[in-house]
Design a protein with these regions (language model features):
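N-terminal subdomain of lithium-sensitive/metallo-dependent phosphomonoesterases centered on the IMPase/IPPase/PAP
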Residues: 1-84, 152-155
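Residue-level signal for inorganic ion chemistry
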Residues: 22, 52, 87, 116, ...
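DPxDG-like acidic metal-binding loop motif
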Residues: 72-126
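A short secondary-structure junction signal
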Residues: 124-126, 149-154
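Short loop->beta-strand "edge-of-pocket" segments that line small-molecule binding or catalytic clefts
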Residues: 130-148, 156-165
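Short helices/loops that flank or line small-molecule/ion binding pockets
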Residues: 169-176
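Conserved small/polar residues in nucleotide/adenosyl-binding loops
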Residues: 177-182
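N-terminal low-complexity segments that are often proline-rich with Ser/Thr-Pro
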Residues: 185-188
Length: 188
């Protein structure tokens, strides 16, 4: 194991670095649509795997974009990643896509980071705080498949709705904007 970076720092750097790489390949405009999404999935997966091979060679690895290696089940430490959550959103130039990186030790999540690269943000388990913003008081729902009942529920609760793409973007939306104040206990 490389002692150059703590697990927390490595988790955060992987989420940030993956996001920067993905923004870079999208920004040059050589690929579009499905080809861009597939290239993004592949490149992000390969880069994360290589970084973990170098810095945490004895750890297990589980990724949405790679074949499962059952050997991870024998490991005390397992990295769980979704290198590009929201491939369709990424490929079409939307901002609601994410990079997920987590370390689980002996079955317990110990470090996690969710990068929202187009928003210039990495949410880290090492840095929890209350945030408010333009989506406060809104229910996050699927941009692609919003439930028919969502508007009714939002109206009954006196809330609005916010259609969001990737699961990571929805999760961060919930963490950031469901609590109107720190005293509500969600992010205190």
């Amino acid at each position: 194991m490389s002692a150059q970076y703590s697990d927390s720092r490595l988790t955060n750097l992987i989420a940030q670095g993956t996001g920067e790489i993905l923004k870079g390949i999208r920004g040059v405009g050589l690929l579009r649509g499905r080809e861009l999404g597939e290239a993004g999935d592949d490149l992000a997966q390969n880069w994360i795997a290589r970084v973990l091979e170098q810095h945490r060679p004895g750890d297990g690895f589980l990724s949405e974009e790679a074949a499962d290696d059952p050997a991870r089940l024998e490991k005390n430490r397992v990295w769980i990643v979704d290198p590009l959550d929201g491939t369709k959103e990424f490929a079409t130039g939307r901002q609601d896509w994410a990079v997920h990186v987590a370390l689980v030790e002996d079955g317990v999540p110990t470090h996690a980071a969710v990068g929202l690269p187009d928003l210039g943000t990495v949410f880290k388990s090492s840095d929890v705080r209350h945030v408010s913003g333009p989506f406060a008081g809104k229910i996050a729902l699927s941009r692609n498949r919003p439930p028919a009942v969502a508007s009714y529920v939002a109206d009954q609760l006196g809330l609005g709705t916010a259609p969001v793409g990737s699961a990571g973007a929805k999760a961060m939306h919930c963490l950031l904007y469901t609590s109107p104040s720190p005293r509500d206990g969600l992010l205190s």
